[in-house]
Design a protein with these regions (language model features):
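Cleavable N-terminal signal peptides of Sec/SRP-targeted secreted and luminal proteins
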Residues: 7-22
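Noncatalytic modules at the cell exterior or secretory-pathway interfaces
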Residues: 126, 236, 301-320, 439-453
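Short acidic/polar inter-strand loop motif in beta-rich domains
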Residues: 135-137, 320-324, 452-461
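Short, surface-exposed beta-strand/strand-loop-strand elements in extracellular ectodomains
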Residues: 250-259, 403-415
Length: 615
């Protein structure tokens, strides 16, 4: 078990959990996740230097009530070919641990040839163990900084490991689960200010009856309290207040930015909101399903209040109700923690990616079709300060079909480290992530956000748009110091799209009435085969842009012709984020198909545009 090599760190972790201090370590390094209605809790600590994770599972055996506990690591929540550590305890008489994996049909649990679940401590109520990020074992999942899934179960019996395998346990509903998690995450941020100086601002709906339709955007415009309108404050944290987790898809809070136009309070569907309400479009806080609270770094806070701050803010809640449920009452919203003593920098939020428009489309039957959204060098050159900006947080966002999202960073012809990347993105888990590496973006840099979509099983085309059945591609970046640049997004230029439809009509003989006709109708008129899918991908990858380099009032920056703007050129495929350092696979394991690979079941690696280059 190599206990000597980890004595100090194991001591730190184990004693920290029992509140005995043998070394000074902050609680910011400890992350936690409730596995079972707060009865069973997982705590973990990432050791970036040694590239390993320490785990502690509290109340795993419930003081001897259960004898076997399994915790597994899965790429997308699938139960087949999942990497499990299985622990057994019999009233402190003996303890047992096996590194295992599930079979392709999820019927059997097989013991690994190499054992990599290193136990630090076990008793009849808890488990503490560690595992390397990458064990170089094809029978183990590689830990990464994107979305992973924890699969767990427990039994009141011991498993029969005859011939080094057993039947996958059939745990009761209360004693198993699957949860998304970012395992390799940055340390938590502690609010520097004392709790006594924190003030709370709440913006939430007022007992709204959720409409029995698939997609509803509900808006509420409210006036800030006088203590906020008089003095500028900094937001240091915001957290969601969710009434109906199965209906609330995402929420945003916007600042109203107007030129002396009067804003009225409002509470109703966003489509019916007065025109003045649409001036409330500067993002202040946002949340999407799966996320928790978000805390700003100690050097920055998001401005709110003061004499120059419009006293109105707008809450927008997206209800996703595909089952058309009725009779549900909702008062969801945000709690915002603010301080009056300002921090060094004003922070801000910027939208990267694609416009919400039906100019972009995804053909059916694709494994991972890419769409690209650009923040071109000409925009950052005009809009960013001379010393640039620092990005400290990022929230990737798509709707139902998104399976991979990343934002690349370019300075001239040089590609810098990625801003954010999730090769196993899930629309069910769209948290704002603190960035361990904080990109420094200078004027003249370019940012390219790519989203990949899985449309297998869909018979018709998917268009860009606001509905949950449409698609989006966005990266909300949190940065400082604040600038006037609110949106840096793109779409294919109108001329390029017209030329594409004309080609489909004249050359491909598709049933398009007019290249200038409604875009959605033109897309839906195309009969999609592999050749036409390739042509569409090539068109998106090479065509000039309609660029939105926008201020918070929705107006573009002056100084450049944003229509038919040039794309940012870059190399395919996407660079490897974490090159593996394994020497070689042991000869007796070379026959085994790695749990990290598969025939396109690993959507993070089976990417359409990469395979296309090999044709």
């Amino acid at each position: 078990m190599e206990m000597d090599s980890c004595n100090a760190r194991c001591c730190v972790f184990a004693l920290l959990l029992t509140t005995v201090v043998c070394y000074n370590i902050s609680s910011e390094r400890l992350h936690n996740l409730n596995l079972n209605y707060q009865l069973t809790k997982l705590l973990w600590m990432v050791d970036w230097h040694e590239k390993e994770v320490f785990f502690h599972i509290n109340n795993s055996f419930e003081h001897g009530k259960f004898r076997t506990f399994g915790i597994g690591f899965s790429q997308r929540g699938e139960l087949s070919r999942t990497d499990f550590c299985v622990f057994s305890s019999v009233h402190n008489l003996y303890h047992q641990v096996y590194d295992t994996y599930t079979s392709r049909d999820n019927k059997h649990l097989l013991i690994d040839t190499l054992q990599n679940c290193d136990v630090i401590h076990m008793d009849d109520n808890s488990i503490t163990f560690r595992r390397k990020f990458d064990t170089c074992d094809p029978q183990d999942i590689v830990f990464h900084s994107g979305t992973m899934y924890l699969v767990w179960w427990r039994m009141d019996t011991l498993l029969d490991w005859k011939n080094d395998f057993t039947t996958v346990p059939n745990a009761s509903l209360q004693n198993h689960g699957t949860l998304p998690v970012q395992l390799l995450r940055a340390d938590k941020i502690r609010i520097e200010e004392k709790s006594q100086v924190l003030k709370k601002v709440e913006v939430h709906l007022d007992a709204v009856v959720v409409p029995a339709v698939e997609t509803t955007y509900w808006c509420k415009i409210q006036r800030l309290d006088p203590w906020l309108t008089d003095v500028k404050h900094h937001i240091v944290q915001f957290e969601p207040l969710i009434d109906n987790e199965d209906l609330v898809h995402h929420m945003e809070v916007f600042q109203c930015v107007t030129n002396n136009m009067e804003i009225h309070t409002y509470n109703g569907p966003c489509n019916d909101m007065p025109a003045s309400g649409r001036l409330c479009s500067k993002v202040m806080a946002l949340w999407a399903m799966g996320a928790g609270s978000f805390t700003y770094p100690k050097e920055a806070g998001l401005p709110i209040g003061g004499k120059e701050f419009n006293p109105h803010i707008r809450l927008e809640v997206h209800f996703n109700n595909p089952e058309l449920k009725s009779g549900f009452i909702d008062s969801s919203g945000m709690r915002i923690n603010v301080v009056s003593k300002l921090r060094r920098y004003d922070a801000a939020i910027m939208e990267l990616g694609l416009e919400y428009t039906d100019k972009m489309a995804i053909p059916p039957g694709q494994i991972a079709f890419p769409l690209y959204g650009y923040c071109i060098a000409e925009c950052t050159q005009l809009a960013l300060p001379k010393k640039g900006i620092v990005i400290f947080g990022s929230q990737l966002h798509t709707h139902l079909r998104g399976v991979r999202v990343l934002t690349r960073h370019f300075r001239g012809k040089e590609e810098l480290p990625l801003v954010n990347r999730d090769d196993f993105f899930s629309h069910h888990y769209q948290e704002i992530r603190q960035l361990r590496y904080k990109p420094h973006v200078l004027p003249g840099d370019a940012l390219v956000t790519t989203c990949y979509y899985d449309t297998r099983g869909y018979k018709t085309l998917t268009l860009g748009g606001f509905s949950i059945s449409d698609e989006m591609c966005v990266n909300y970046i949190h940065y400082y110091p604040a600038t006037a640049l609110e949106v840096c997004k793109s779409s294919i230029s109108d001329k390029s799209l017209h030329d594409y439809f004309d080609y489909m009509k004249q050359v491909e003989k598709q049933n398009i009435s007019s290249a200038s006709g409604p875009r959605s109708e033109n897309y839906l008129s195309i009969q999609w085969d592999e050749s036409r899918v390739n042509e569409l991908a090539d068109t998106y990858l090479s065509s000039p842009l309609s660029m939105q380099c926008n201020r918070s009032d929705g107006m573009r920056f002056d100084g450049f012709a944003w229509e038919n703007a040039p794309i940012t050129t870059f190399k395919l495929p996407v660079p490897v984020s974490e090159p593996r350092t394994c020497a070689s696979i042991p000869s007796h394991l070379r026959w085994f198909k790695s749990l990290n690979e598969g025939l396109c079941d690993n959507l993070g690696d089976c990417i359409y545009s990469e395979s296309k280059l090999k044709e």
